[in-house]
């Protein structure tokens, strides 16, 4: 199975990694992306945008909603952790969600998923009428034109077609191993192999 969709473009394959996971290869042992699973929300000729989906931070939704003065009426959400989404705009909230809905500032990813940055979605979440499935992050990961493609050729990232099951039905610590299992690879053994290469 191909992990990347290719189109022929003047002798060079053009990759479209929208709705794919990026796994940080174990050679990245330091920095913000070490051990991360990143979901690519948009990838085109201008670059790529994704959010890290397996790195919760020490901030609950209840605390975040208090900080932005939005009541959170769904008590079961108040202890859910916000995630580190990436180093770009690290103070801004991003909501990856299903179903899409109609929001003021939304990037439609595919027929099921969207990434929303406007406050209206947070207000509806606070009222208990928000999307059924969601991951809320602070910040995102961004790549300039050609940067992600170059990093992939340098073996910085492994690409895997994304799964809503992994995004929304597994705890953060289970997402990376589950994504790797789609390829039949145990991430922990991959990490050990790098240490012995």
Language-model segments: which ranges?
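A short aromatic-anchored loop/beta-hairpin motif
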Residues: 2-136, 141-197
